[in-house]
Amino acid sequence: WEGRPQELGGKEIPLCAGCDQHILDRFILKALDRHWHSKCLKCSDCHTPLAERCFSRGESLYCKDDFFKRFGTKCAACQLGIPPTQVVRRAQDFVYHLHCFACVVCKRQLATGDEFYLMEDSRLVCKADYETAKQREAEATAKRPRTTITAKQLETLKSAYNTSPKPARHVREQLSSETGLDMRVVQVWFQNRRAKEKRLKKDAGRQRWGQYFRNMKRARGGSKSDKDSVQEEGQDSDAEVSFTDEPSMAEMGPANGLYGGLGEPAPALGRPSGAPGSFPLEHGGLAGPEQYGELRPSSPYGVPSSPAALQSLPGPQPLLSSLVYPEAGLGLVPAGPPGGPPPMRVLAGNGPSSDLSTGSSGGYPDFPASPASWLDEVDHAQF
């Protein structure tokens, strides 16, 4: 072969792209526009001779299996290519090998009919493990961080609270350095302490009013037994501080004088069912403290500070004693605290006549020809 010319019959002998030697075989393979020996045309990955079919990418040649493994659809779990002849599992847009289609927690391979959850990173979690993880997460979120304060630290904080219930920042920094507690812990302790003081004052006021109304009930000779019992709320421990981003209810409630409380609707001017257009008559009794929720500290209408103060208040003085409107059967009586312009309460006339009315409210009396003749009878000196 050394003396054999490079041209045979006027044609140039091709060179093999694999070994760079002249191809003198009977059969010549051609791929990627180049000539190959049959033994030189191999897969770039497994080096298997490519006799029947080959796949190319760039300057490399591959067999069918290696080509799809490298450039075909990849498994979402192992990121390896999946041959087109292999059975796969699908979850939405993700494709998995059969052995890769398993729960990442318990490693159990998921079969047809099993319930699972698909995470954002294409991982699979079986239903049992997912619900268990969710429950643990909820329990961990519900537990707020708590700090236990020693007796010495508690004594220092109480002493500072007695001096100033709302200390400045530099005072809190000093307390933090003295007690060794975090600034946030000191701040939360003072917030909880102030809320507790407000709650205790509010509960004490409720007990005083409740006792007063029970005494009034007994004084009137009520036959029903009083089953109301005052439950003392358990006192929070000052040695435990819990963190929360929400303001305390004591600071948001009506105790700060900004907002009125929401309670049962007052029946003073309500319309009872079955009697449309009429208003109930009130016979005596003292207004409870909840009816003064709309008053401001600067209001001329004073709110009694204690039940004992109500006993010393003088009774209402009637402003209009004989002015009646027979055509509507309505009378006007004063109903309000003394010391200011009393509001007027409208009383229904569809029933017994009022004690303050001089005429009959059950019928229509004969009116004089001129309204001035009966309007002059009203004593205007009272105004």
Curated annotation (Swiss-Prot):
Residues bearing the modification Phosphoserine: 56, 223
Indicate the principal place this protein occupies in or around the cell.
nucleus
Which parts of the sequence are annotated with region: Disordered?
A: 197-383
Per UniProt, the ranges with Pro residues bias are 335-344
The UniProt regions of compositional bias labelled Low complexity, in chain numbering, are 307-334
Q: Which residues bind DNA?
A: 142-201
Phosphothreonine modification sites?
48
Which of the residues bear the PTM Phosphotyrosine? 212
Q: Quote one Gene Ontology molecular function term.
A: RNA polymerase II transcription regulatory region sequence-specific DNA binding
Q: Domain of life of the organism in this record?
A: Eukaryota
Fetch the CDD domains from UniProt: homeodomain, LIM1_Lhx3b, LIM2_Lhx3_Lhx4
Localization recorded for this chain is: Nucleus
Q: Where is the LIM zinc-binding domain?
A: 14-73, 73-136
Iron among keywords:
no
Please give the record's comment on domains: The LIM domain specifically interacts with the Pit-1 POU domain and is required for synergistic interactions with Pit-1, but not for basal transcriptional activation events.
Describe the protein's quaternary organization and the partners it interacts with. Answer: Interacts with POU1F1. At neuronal promoters, interacts with LDB1, in motor neurons LDB1 is displaced by ISL1 and a ternary complex is formed in which ISL1 contacts both LHX3 and LDB1; allosteric structural changes in the DNA binding domain of LHX3, induced by the ISL1-LHX3 interaction, may explain differences in sequence specificity of the different complexes. Interacts with LDB2. May interact with CITED2/MRG1.
Name the record gives this protein? LIM/homeobox protein Lhx3
Supply the source organism for this entry.
Sus scrofa
Taxonomic lineage is:
Eukaryota, Metazoa, Chordata, Craniata, Vertebrata
